[in-house]
A protein has these predicted regions:
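Conserved short alpha-helical segments that host acidic/polar catalytic motifs at enzyme active sites
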Residues: 1-200
């Protein structure tokens, strides 16, 4: 199996956009998830001075859902108030750049739009920076990760009918050190956000 670290994807199922986030961690596997209002958070449970291991992972508004591996979740969501998704990703990822930790961890981000078959991915690494606007494909996900994924890849997913089922499907991916997964799906008049993972 491959270790991809923080992993996220955007796609289309039954004509509706979805997004997911998968936390794989070797150094800090003891985390918990908190879903509150229009946001979801990953909270570290191990004592550390590392500022990057607790963060908002999902933030939604009326039109968009944002999924990332860090504090840039909220900044991208705020930028979407006045900017289109591509520009929001470019501006925020360029400003915040990669994480200044021992691994120079890249910042990754995904955006989906209500009622749309278009999505956006972004990546800010030490030696690589890109933002892509993508036409989503039915039953597929475009996936990027902090490690061991070259750009982004296309994956097929089994059918699901809820954000929780999506999170369970993501946990079945053959990746190392999986801790928890979040699913984001378009529901009636809102975004649904659910989490699945090992109990703490």
């Amino acid at each position: 199996m491959t270790y991809t670290g923080r992993t996220l994807g955007i796609g289309l199922m039954n004509g509706k956009p979805f997004a997911f986030y998968l936390l794989c961690s070797r150094s800090f596997p003891n985390r918990k998830a908190v879903i509150k209002g229009n946001a979801a958070y990953i909270i570290n449970q191990t004592e550390t001075d590392n500022p990057y291991v607790s963060y908002p992972v999902v933030r939604t508004n009326e039109m968009y859902a944002v999924v990332t591996n860090g504090l840039h979740t909220d900044f991208i969501s705020q930028a979407l108030v006045w900017e289109k998704p591509r520009k929001a990703l470019v501006h925020v990822l360029d400003a915040m750049d990669y994480e200044r930790d021992a691994y120079n961890t890249p910042r990754i981000a995904g955006i989906i739009e209500r009622g749309s078959e278009r999505g956006w991915l972004g990546f800010a690494g030490r030696d690589e920076f890109w933002v892509r606007s993508l036409r989503l494909k039915e039953g597929k996900a475009f996936v990027t990760a902090t490690y061991n994924v070259d750009g982004f890849v296309e994956l097929g997913l089994n059918g699901f009918s809820s954000a929780g089922e999506l999170a369970l499907e993501v946990l079945k991916l053959p990746l190392e050190h999986k801790v928890m997964a979040f699913g984001v799906t378009e529901a009636e008049n809102r975004w649904a956000v659910e989490m699945s993972g090992r109990p703490f």
